[in-house]
């Protein structure tokens, strides 16, 4: 189900994890705790810094999020890898929004920089994904640059996020 305005609620994102949003052959988001997104604010086919597409999404932060209890005891901080994974999740979600089929897999990232952190007193994480290229055909792949903001302050950047969609994942 492609919303023209590209906005999706938490309920929609959870439906994606069950294969109910983009159909049984479309890419899925992870379920439950590994879903690092509460809502997608907007997606465009021709927006962003490179004019190839843009996604903006958010996660509400509260002190009882699962990772704060274990990373680290007496020094809670969101693992940076979860912010990176959220950006990969959004690249795959965008490929599904464009009506591509296959199982999503992160294929790599060029460079990641961490300049800040998400702490239990943070309120909101914003993810911004600027697409550089979408390849369709035998290979389906999205390549994008991303950034993560905590309460409006940029804390992570990732260049050349790559996600592919595969019909067969038994490789």
UniProtKB/Swiss-Prot annotation:
GO terms for cellular component: cytoplasm. Its EC number is 4.2.1.59, 5.3.3.14. It is found in: Cytoplasm. The active site is at residue 71. Pathway: Lipid metabolism; fatty acid biosynthesis. The keyword rRNA-binding does not apply. InterPro entries: FabA (IPR010083), FabA_FabZ (IPR013114), HotDog_dom_sf (IPR029069). Its main location: cytoplasm. It catalyses: a (3R)-hydroxyacyl-[ACP] = a (2E)-enoyl-[ACP] + H2O; (3R)-hydroxydecanoyl-[ACP] = (2E)-decenoyl-[ACP] + H2O; (2E)-decenoyl-[ACP] = (3Z)-decenoyl-[ACP]. Keywords: Cytoplasm, Fatty acid biosynthesis, Fatty acid metabolism, Isomerase, Lipid biosynthesis, Lipid metabolism, Lyase. Necessary for the introduction of cis unsaturation into fatty acids. Catalyzes the dehydration of (3R)-3-hydroxydecanoyl-ACP to E-(2)-decenoyl-ACP and then its isomerization to Z-(3)-decenoyl-ACP. Can catalyze the dehydratase reaction for beta-hydroxyacyl-ACPs with saturated chain lengths up to 16:0, being most active on intermediate chain length. Homodimer. This is 3-hydroxydecanoyl-[acyl-carrier-protein] dehydratase. It comes from Hamiltonella defensa subsp. Acyrthosiphon pisum (strain 5AT).
